[in-house]
Regions:
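TRNA-recognition modules of translation machinery and tRNA-sensing kinases, especially anticodon-binding
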Residues: 3-385
Length: 390
């Protein structure tokens, strides 16, 4: 296994408050058991809350999206509470199968058998719908064990949004604002590539939905998100004098149907920016609002921030270096292009080791690397695997 360290110094991670038998996460103490695998370096990220910092790139993008939807249709924007959730909240209440790979210790950070660090914003979906919210946005830090490179990090930030209403009010609730939004998008000159068949066999309407109602929900979804694309990319994407282009692609997601991915043509290439769709009725039923219908979307804030600010490495978001942080500000919005600062030349280190059995997962090794070197390692590459003979 080859490691590519980043320039800098190793940093000690405090484990104050923890013991050999307990683990401390966000002020709560948990008894260690056979499921516990959340390391101190990950737990130390919890208080940072980058999405709540108004002058941080993640916080800037979150606030821009929240402000846009508040002006459009009065969406309520929320920040998720503690990332410590139960297995029931993160998996069971959302219909994850008992053998779903996302439940694996190789993918998820467990505090004990019953508690973990949320892996998606949807862990709070049932609670939000149950509170009666119909137009909402939720931003959160989420945690997943992952590989080591410039585009992956075990802590990242998601933003989820939904617009629902009672079934009998669907046509009147969605239709009027949709017509107004479609007209505004057309006036702005957005070029929309969307020749998908409505309710076609490859991306059908749900059996529980009247086709006319489903069609207006899809139109509402597309109008709102086309408007969001304009708000985020409109000025930057027209630097070359060409109109902004967006395209809609059929997709498959477990909680929506029909489902779509949205791509924007930005600086010479198509970029996927979010996934969305009409909410599955059984998902709303699990949340106790089966009498309602509507749409939802989800996006990664890091992905948008990396594109809009030209940030080349996802790990830079966690930097406390003033050379990084001073480049951004809430008052400047998107008027910032990241300027790289010097780093020492790369250094390669090769490591060889024997595995006692085949159950060892690559993510287990990545975790060891992060614990020892923090974010100093840029990349890990498996150079060769030698089978045991005899």
């Amino acid at each position: 296994m080859r490691l590519l360290p980043r320039a800098g110094y190793l940093r000690a991670v405090s484990t104050a408050g923890a013991s050999a038998d307990t683990i401390l996460a966000d002020g709560r103490r948990f008894e260690r058991d056979e499921w516990t695998n959340a390391p101190p370096s990950i737990l130390a990220r919890i208080p940072r809350r980058l999405h709540a910092q108004p002058s941080h790139p993640i916080g800037i993008i979150r606030a821009l999206i929240a402000d846009h939807f508040a002006q459009l249709s009065g969406f309520r924007s929320m920040l998720a509470p503690s990332p410590v959730v139960t297995v029931a909240q993160n998996f069971d209440e959302l219909g994850f199968a008992p053998d779903h790979p996302g439940r694996s210790r190789s993918d998820t950070y467990y505090l004990d058998r019953a508690h973990l660090l949320r892996t998606h914003t949807s862990a709070h979906e049932v609670e939000i719908f149950g509170s009666g919210h119909e137009r909402w946005l939720l931003a959160a830090d989420v945690y997943r064990r992952d590989e080591i490179d410039a585009s992956h990090y075990p802590v990242f930030h998601q933003m989820e949004g939904a617009f629902v209403c009672a079934r009998e009010r669907a046509m009147e609730t969605f239709e009027a604002p949709t017509i107004a939004l479609e007209a505004a998008v057309e006036r702005a000159g957005l070029v929309v590539e969307d020749d998908l068949p409505r309710g076609g066999p490859s991306n059908p309407y749900q059996d529980a939905h009247d086709p006319a109602m489903a069609a207006i929900i899809v139109r509402s979804l597309k109008a709102h998100l086309n408007s969001l694309v304009l708000a985020l990319f409109g000025r930057l994407a027209t630097e070359d004098g060409q109109p902004l282009k967006v395209r809609w692609i059929e997709a498959t997601f477990p909680w929506t149907g029909p489902s779509f991915e949205v791509e924007v043509f930005f600086r010479g290439k198509w970029l996927e920016i979010l996934g969305c769709g009409v909410m599955q009725q059984h998902a709303l039923e699990r949340s106790g609002v089966g009498h309602k219908v509507g749409w939802a979307f989800g996006l990664g804030l890091e992905r948008l921030a990396m594109v809009l600010f030209s940030i080349p490495d996802i790990r830079l978001f966690w930097s406390t270096d003033d050379r990084f942080l001073s480049q951004f500000g809430a008052e400047r919005g998107l008027d910032t292009t990241f300027k790289p600062y010097s780093r020492f030349p790369a250094l390669y280190q090769d490591i060889s080791f024997w595995l006692p059995d085949a159950s060892f997962h690559a993510n287990d090794f990545y975790e060891i690397v992060r614990e020892v070197a923090g974010d100093l390692v840029e990349d890990t590459v498996l150079v060769r695997r030698q089978p045991r003979l005899g």
